[in-house]
């Protein structure tokens, strides 16, 4: 993939869904699938799927469709999931613990190497054999260990400070669960997961049905 190619984030955000469904097809021993069949499964049009995939190359054959395993492997590579990424998790409350316990991350190549929190009652507790450390140790850890992703699960009032420390420590990817839009340099990539916004969208849809 040409990294300088201008591909919209809308296309990029659809790729994980293709990736997930193709993985399910492989588990069910499906060897090939047409764009029409794939679209029916995931709720996209066949034309949309072809346009998305054409951004990265020519994967299908007319009259044959897509080789499921080959397409899965290609999307896996496009998304960078064929590599490993070290992550640190800051905030070991309910959301943080749920993320730390999510075993699917290992299969995506994301390795949580350390967990930090400010609560003395949590420090020393282990989550999947990873001991929760004092947040004051974060800076020194980032200096001594290679980390790619910072996962922020702290309260809103602490999120920007934590983000700044992660960035100062060399991290260029932040997965933010705090209900705040972080101020970061242009070379730092942030993916926000604002739960209240997500559920508000659902509530709106339910409200429209009443």
UniProtKB/Swiss-Prot annotation:
GO molecular function, one term: DNA-binding transcription factor activity
Main subcellular localisation: cytoplasm
Keyword Acetylation recorded: no
SUPFAM superfamilies: NAD(P)-binding Rossmann-fold domains, Winged helix' DNA-binding domain
Subunit annotation: Homodimer.
DNA-binding span(s): 17-56
Cellular component GO terms, alphabetical: cytoplasm
Protein name: Redox-sensing transcriptional repressor Rex
PANTHER family found in the cross-reference section: REDOX-SENSING TRANSCRIPTIONAL REPRESSOR REX, REDOX-SENSING TRANSCRIPTIONAL REPRESSOR REX 1
SMART domains cross-referenced by the UniProt entry: CoA_binding
Location of the protein in the cell: Cytoplasm
Family: Belongs to the transcriptional regulatory Rex family.
Function: Modulates transcription in response to changes in cellular NADH/NAD(+) redox state.
Keyword tRNA processing found: no
Biological-process GO terms, alphabetical: negative regulation of DNA-templated transcription; response to redox state
Superkingdom of origin organism: Bacteria
